[in-house]
């Protein structure tokens, strides 16, 4: 007669359990249960309807492995777990890890309180990883009360073939073919209250391996454990939150531009002539005027026609500094002149608006003959209104320095040019208005080889940039076809009543109460309480 026998295979009976049984056909089968994943902690979920909604499972979920080996011994036998034709399920129960001394009055509810909830039974899953075997997984087990417990798993087998039945049934209470095989227990674990629970841990590699093969296991990644060492005040928590958000302000980088020197050693140098400017030219500077005929090889070059000759050796006023000089104020371009300078006559000094040097110097241009020189016919340029006269920038007369025209800018170098410029609309033909002089930061590379630009004569003014259309009026509100509101129709019900007043009957107005209408008129009441009058047709059929 073959009966199940419990055999301890290791020093720890809580980790691996084996039994041996002999079937009706004298087959020697070995059952080996191993708890691969032990539970470590749990949170007490309590009792009641609220406990079912906020229930935390035992962490990590217990995983039990089953192997069936056929042979005279485990070492010499063959693993037939996948070939054995039977059904297995594992039932979990909870028990106290420490013995509890009970009182004198004891009853069934006190001895075995129902504190384990969830799904306590699990069927066997045949998995290939981590090894080919049968696995029982318990992802939904919870404990209602806090304490120190351990889980006990009972293995039940439902044999399908009669040849695999036992020689004699071990338990007569179970139906034929259903047998209890063995039991294994886990290591003790703590069940914490909601306040003391440290939190769920990150899922183990075994849980992830089992979940990858289709088993229902909750996977948690990047779990943040709660710290309950010390509970600071609300002010401390706000300070910590602010410290986490606060970032270190980077140190300001050193300014690559050095400070302006106060030396006057560069006053007698020639004006700076930039050969290659990296800045983007403005609209006036980027325009290239067509080449005009000139004769640089003539012995006597004519003076610039109909244009104020720039002052000789015009140093940029914004580069003058020192103790004996004051910072100049820039002015706009000078109004046009309709005459040329006489031959050999020096240019009269311009009266400055500020403390400028007034020493006069001979003109740097060579003397010319009085022969007229023309550039050909040129149509007049239209303008809306003559430009207001603007003061010419001051300059120092130095006969030894080359010619460099000044800028038309009437603002300091730190100002910013406006983004949009409103141009006047064109008008009838008016006399020619001279354009502003070139910028002080933009100098001519030669002395008199290029004729001055006349951009105003080549570029026509643009129309003013204004809004062409006004904003459209809002569309009228169209009737939606819905019903009118009750307060709109029966507005008399919304008025307050004082001193015993009563609501007026809207169907009997003051004007028609107790009055009889005319013979050719009729009265009718509308839905809003107003009394309407209709006049009948005098003609009768």
Curated annotation (Swiss-Prot):
It is found in: Nucleus; Cytoplasm. GO terms for cellular component: cytoplasm; nucleus. Residues 299-314, 345-355, 425-439 have a biased composition (Pro residues). Residues 444-472 are annotated as: PEST. Residues 230-244 have a biased composition (Basic and acidic residues). A motif (Nuclear localization signal) lies at residues 40-45. Disruption phenotype: Exhibit early chlamydospore differentiation under nutrient stress conditions. Impairs gliotoxin production and induction of other secondary metabolism-related genes including genes encoding nonribosomal peptide synthetases, 2 polyketide synthases, an O-methyl transferase, and cytochrome P450. Impairs mycoparasitism. Residues 26-220 form the Velvet domain. Component of the heterotrimeric velvet complex composed of LAE1, VEL1 and VEL2; VEL1 acting as a bridging protein between LAE1 and VEL2. This is Developmental and secondary metabolism regulator VEL1. GO terms for biological process: sporulation resulting in formation of a cellular spore. Residues 289-298 have a biased composition (Low complexity). Keywords: Cytoplasm, Nucleus, Sporulation, Transcription, Transcription regulation. The C-terminal PEST domain is a region rich in proline, glutamic acid, serine and threonine residues that is required for the light-dependent regulation of development and secondary metabolism. InterPro entries: Velvet, Velvet_dom, Velvet_dom_sf. Its main location: nucleus. Belongs to the velvet family. VeA subfamily. Component of the velvet transcription factor complex that controls sexual/asexual developmental ratio in response to light, promoting sexual development in the darkness while stimulating asexual sporulation under illumination. The velvet complex acts as a global regulator for secondary metabolite gene expression. Controls the expression of the gliotoxin gene cluster. Plays a key role in mycoparasitism. Signal peptide: none annotated. It holds the Pfam family Velvet. Disulfide bonds: none annotated. The keyword Nucleus applies. Residues 222-447, 464-483 are annotated as: Disordered.
């Amino acid at each position: 007669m073959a009966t199940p026998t419990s055999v301890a295979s290791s020093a720890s009976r809580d980790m691996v359990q084996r039994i041996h049984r002999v079937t009706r056909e004298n087959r020697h089968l070995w059952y080996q249960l191993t708890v691969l994943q032990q539970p470590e902690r749990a949170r007490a979920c309590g009792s009641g309807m609220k406990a079912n909604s906020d229930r935390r499972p035992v962490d990590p979920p217990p995983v039990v492995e089953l192997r069936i080996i056929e042979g005279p011994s485990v070492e010499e036998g063959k693993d037939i777990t996948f070939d054995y034709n039977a059904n297995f399920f594992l039932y979990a129960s909870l028990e106290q890890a420490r013995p509890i001394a009970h009182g004198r009055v004891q009853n069934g509810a006190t001895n075995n309180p129902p504190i384990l909830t969830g799904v306590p039974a699990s069927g066997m899953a045949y998995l290939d990883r981590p090894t080919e075997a049968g696995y029982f997984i318990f992802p939904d087990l919870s404990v209602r009360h806090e304490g120190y417990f351990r889980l006990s798993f009972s293995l039940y087998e439902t044999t399908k073939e009669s040849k695999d039945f036992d020689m004699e049934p071990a338990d007569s209470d179970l139906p034929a073919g259903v047998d209890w095989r063995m039991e294994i227990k886990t290591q003790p674990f703590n069940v914490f209250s909601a306040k003391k629970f440290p939190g769920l841990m990150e899922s183990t590699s075994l849980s992830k391996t089992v979940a990858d093969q289709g088993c229902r296991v909750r996977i948690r990644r990047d779990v943040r454990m709660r710290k309950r060492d010390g509970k600071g005040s609300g002010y401390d928590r706000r300070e910590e939150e602010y410290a986490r958000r606060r970032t270190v302000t980077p140190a300001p980088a050193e300014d690559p531009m050095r400070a302006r020197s106060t030396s006057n050693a560069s006053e007698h140098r020639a004006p700076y002539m930039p050969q290659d400017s990296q800045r983007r030219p403005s609209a006036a500077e980027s325009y290239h005027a067509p080449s005009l005929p000139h004769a640089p090889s003539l012995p006597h070059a004519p003076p610039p026609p109909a244009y104020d000759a720039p002052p000789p050796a015009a140093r940029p006023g914004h580069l003058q500094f020192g103790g004996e000089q004051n910072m100049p104020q820039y002015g706009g371009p000078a109004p046009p002149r309709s005459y040329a300078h006489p031959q050999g006559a020096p240019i009269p000094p311009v009266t400055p608006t500020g403390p400028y040097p007034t020493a006069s110097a001979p003109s740097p241009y060579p003397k010319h003959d009085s022969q007229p020189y023309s550039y050909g016919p040129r149509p007049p340029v239209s303008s809306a209104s003559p430009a207001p006269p603007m003061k010419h920038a001051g300059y120092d007369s130095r006969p030894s320095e080359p010619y460099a025209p000044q800028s038309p800018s009437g603002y300091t170098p730190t100002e910013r040019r406006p983004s949009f410029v409103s141009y006047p609309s064109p008008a009838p033909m008016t006399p020619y208005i001279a354009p502003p002089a070139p910028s002080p930061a933009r100098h001519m590379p030669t002395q008199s080889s290029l004729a001055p630009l006349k951009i105003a004569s080549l570029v026509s003014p643009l129309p003013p940039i204004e809004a062409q259309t006004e904003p459209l009026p809002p569309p009228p509100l169209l009737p939606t076809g819905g019903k009118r509101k009750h307060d709109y129709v029966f507005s008399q019900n919304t008025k307050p009543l004082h001193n015993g007043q009563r609501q007026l009957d809207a169907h009997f107005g003051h004007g028609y109460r107790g009055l009889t209408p005319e013979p050719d008129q009729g009265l009718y009441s509308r839905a809003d309480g107003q009394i309407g009058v209709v006049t009948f047709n005098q003609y009768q059929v």
